[in-house]
Amino acid sequence: MLPPIRCFSCGKPLGHLWEEFNERVNKGEDPKKVLDDLGLERYCCRRTLLSAVVVFPVIAKFKKV
């Protein structure tokens, strides 16, 4: 799956927040604090970023048949 571009529920654009969210969480920062700092208040938008799993780099390693 590619990083989320919009919230699946309300449609709010989230793509511009993905890189900062992902970098800060990977550095060990608390996801709740990161989401609060990014200004995401709606639980649907928070869920979209929290549950996103980017598997494209893994899939890209396989050769076409």
Curated annotation (Swiss-Prot):
Positions of transmembrane segments: none
GO cellular component term of the entry, any: cytoplasm
Leading EC class: transferase
GO biological process terms, semicolon-separated: DNA-templated transcription
Textual note on the cofactor: Binds 1 zinc ion.
Binding site for Zn(2+): 7, 10, 44-45
UniProt keywords, alphabetically: Cytoplasm, DNA-directed RNA polymerase, Metal-binding, Nucleotidyltransferase, Transcription, Transferase, Zinc
Gene Ontology MF term list: DNA binding; DNA-directed RNA polymerase activity; zinc ion binding
EC number: 2.7.7.6
Domain of life: Archaea
Catalytic activity of the protein: RNA(n) + a ribonucleoside 5'-triphosphate = RNA(n+1) + diphosphate
Cross-referenced InterPro entries: RNA_pol_su_RPB10 (IPR023580), RNA_pol_suN_Zn-BS (IPR020789), RPABC5/Rpb10 (IPR000268)
Stored SUPFAM superfamilies: RNA polymerase subunit RPB10 (SSF46924)
Location within or outside the cell: Cytoplasm
Family the UniProt entry places it in: Belongs to the archaeal Rpo10/eukaryotic RPB10 RNA polymerase subunit family.
Record note on quaternary structure: Part of the RNA polymerase complex.
Reported function: DNA-dependent RNA polymerase (RNAP) catalyzes the transcription of DNA into RNA using the four ribonucleoside triphosphates as substrates.
Protein name per UniProt: DNA-directed RNA polymerase subunit Rpo10
Protein's gene: rpo10
